[in-house]
């Protein structure tokens, strides 16, 4: 499964377990297909902050899936 599709599905299952900012940024990146720069401007945070938030969300979603296994 393509990474973007997989993360999008994981967001549907586990998104509410992320922080509000992680969820917002991840949804904009994976579901709305916005760039890091566009998200940074919308969220009023640095581009690097957007990237870090996405990476933390990806890690958290992966951890939740490995423990709960609802998607697989």
Regions found by a protein language model. Name each.
Residues 53-56:
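Residues within the DNA-recognition helix of helix-turn-helix
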Residues 58-65:
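C-terminal flanking helix
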Residues 25, 38-40, 50:
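Hydrophobic positions on the alpha-helical face of helix-turn-helix-like DNA-binding modules
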Residues 66-72:
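Short, basic, alpha-helical segments at the C-terminal edge of helix-turn-helix-like DNA-binding modules
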Residues 20-32:
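Short amphipathic alpha helix immediately N-terminal
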Residues 9-18:
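Short amphipathic alpha-helical boundary/capping segments
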């Amino acid at each position: 499964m393509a990474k973007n599709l997989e993360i999008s599905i994981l967001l549907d299952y586990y998104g509410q377990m992320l922080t509000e900012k992680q969820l917002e940024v991840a949804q904009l990146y994976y579901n709305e297909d916005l760039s890091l720069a566009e998200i940074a401007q919308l969220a009023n945070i640095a581009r690097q902050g957007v990237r870090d938030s996405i990476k933390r969300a990806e890690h958290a979603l992966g951890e939740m899936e490995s423990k709960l296994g609802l998607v697989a």
